[in-house]
């Protein structure tokens, strides 16, 4: 009797797990080796248009890259990348760039930086904060994108 109950319990668990996987089939295409949170926001009541946002995090739980996918945008993805200094503070926020047909996957930082530099025609397509030299880490200045700053 115990074996029958055990088999029924395992069967119920496995059927629930397979059900959860089929409902989120669009998420199976994401980068499995990176920590991420994926959200889908419907932009029309009929459910035919949506926006997917995938936030990828580094090993310390800091936001590293955000990818926006739109259902009506020819499969183009807008990618935003963020860098940190050795103290864990934001050091550079790169301007967003478009990558076609990526499916929301994580893109290597060097590829994002190269594309941003080429897209904007500037050697510094990122904003950059300057922090005070104290344990409080207060921001003193904020430089905008572009080498002119």
Predicted region positions:
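Acidic, low-complexity segments
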Residues: 4, 18-149
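Bacterial N-terminal signal peptides
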Residues: 7-15
């Amino acid at each position: 009797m115990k074996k029958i109950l055990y088999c029924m319990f395992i069967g119920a668990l496995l059927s629930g797990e397979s059900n959860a996987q089929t409902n989120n089939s669009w998420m199976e295409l994401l980068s499995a080796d990176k920590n991420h949170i994926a959200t889908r926001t419907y932009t029309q009541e009929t459910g035919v248009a949506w926006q997917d946002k995938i936030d990828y995090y580094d090993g310390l739980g800091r936001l590293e890259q955000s990818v926006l996918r739109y259902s009506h945008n020819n499969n183009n993805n807008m990618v935003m990348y963020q860098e940190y200094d050795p103290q864990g503070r934001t050091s550079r926020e790169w301007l967003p760039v478009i990558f076609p047909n990526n499916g929301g996957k994580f893109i290597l930082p060097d590829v994002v930086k190269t594309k941003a530099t080429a897209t904007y025609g500037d050697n510094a397509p990122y904003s950059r904060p300057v922090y005070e030299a104290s344990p409080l880490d207060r921001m003193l200045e904020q430089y905008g994108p572009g080498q002119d700053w």
